[in-house]
């Protein structure tokens, strides 16, 4: 059986609880959407990520009350180079959504969501440690996996295979 093609039109996906809530909250913050293999991905403006997470967490009809993970993708040499990815779950409604924020440049930064989900603390530290993404407002942004004196961020595509010497 062939897979259905991805849906990328916002109008076709407005009925999804996460997208509907974000469009109700701030239409301009939603940059793009993709529904593929029963999973919804929403690209959000980096300036609005904290408020978007808060809007989804506090949504009355379908609260996305659990932050499963935060990770990052390095698309080097493309620009914007980085995407920070937030995986959210609505436990009572068994719905999932993925939020993505595009970040450019050699010193990527985005607002921390630790004020929305305290569990974001270690996820953000891991992304900082391995990719070098800074999270503004993070209560304790320091390395979590690599030694404190480690040079660079080893999951960046421009990181030397043999490490810095």
Residue ranges of predicted features:
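Terminal low-complexity/charged segments
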Residues: 1-165
């Amino acid at each position: 059986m062939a897979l259905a093609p991805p849906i990328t039109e916002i109008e076709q996906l407005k009925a999804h609880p996460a997208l509907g809530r974000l469009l109700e909250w701030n239409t301009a913050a939603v940059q793009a959407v993709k529904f593929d293999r029963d999973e919804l991905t929403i690209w959000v403006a980096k300036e609005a990520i904290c408020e978007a997470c808060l809007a989804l967490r506090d949504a009355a009809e379908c609260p996305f009350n659990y932050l499963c993970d935060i990770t990052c993708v390095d698309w080097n040499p493309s620009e914007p180079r980085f995407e920070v990815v937030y995986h959210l779950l609505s436990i009572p409604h068994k719905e999932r959504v993925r939020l993505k924020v595009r970040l450019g440049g050699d010193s990527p930064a985005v607002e921390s969501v630790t004020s929305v989900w305290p569990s974001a603390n270690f996820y953000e530290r891991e992304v900082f440690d391995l990719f070098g993404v800074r999270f503004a407002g993070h209560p304790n942004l320091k390395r979590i996996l690599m030694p404190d004196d480690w040079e660079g961020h080893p999951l960046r595509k421009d990181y030397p295979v043999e490490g810095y010497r």
